[in-house]
Amino acid sequence: MASAVLGLTLRWVMFLSAVLLLLLPGASAQEPPGVGCSEYTNRSCEECLRNVSCLWCNENKACLDYPVRKILPPASLCKLSSARWGVCWVNFEALIITMSVLGGSVLLGITVCCCCCCRRKRSRKPDKSDERAMREQEERRVRQEERRAEMKSRHDEIRKKYGLFKEQNPYEKF
């Protein structure tokens, strides 16, 4: 089970690496820092997003400065379904959903791994009720052995008293 989860997690890591490699070329071709984002308004999305500090609004073909003080651009600036950042083919809604699913999957994978490890650790060590049952069984066995030895000694005394004691070598009498 843990190897399946590990394989699944490894696949997600490879998938995320591939996505990052796809996003990297768009982020690496940056414009010089002196150029403002508003100069790329009414041009193309690719030209606007060459500068990583720019945000392309597909709705009105505007290139805007990314609001760095907020994580997501406000709806007054541009709708999330129309906002593009990094690459032109991914909008913010899809990005948020994808990142949420990936984050949830990673958390779920970690939780499953932790639960599996805890279960294995617990199953290796007997719990208190099992230990108590084993201890009681051992005590009963010891008491039974004591009673058996006591009964054997009583029987041997009775045999000795009446001369029925079994000797080690029955041919010794002759």
Swiss-Prot record:
The keyword Coiled coil applies. Interacts with PTTG1. Residues 115-174 are cytoplasmic. Residues 30-93 are extracellular. The lineage of its organism: Eukaryota, Metazoa, Chordata, Craniata, Vertebrata. Glycans are attached at residues 42, 51. The chain crosses the membrane at residues 94-114. The modification Phosphotyrosine is found at residue 171. It is found in: Cell membrane; Cytoplasm; Nucleus. The keyword Membrane applies. This is Pituitary tumor-transforming gene 1 protein-interacting protein. One of its GO terms (biological process) is positive regulation of protein ubiquitination. Residues 127-163 form a coiled coil. GO terms for cellular component: cytoplasm; nucleus; plasma membrane. It is a single-pass type I membrane protein. It comes from Rattus norvegicus.
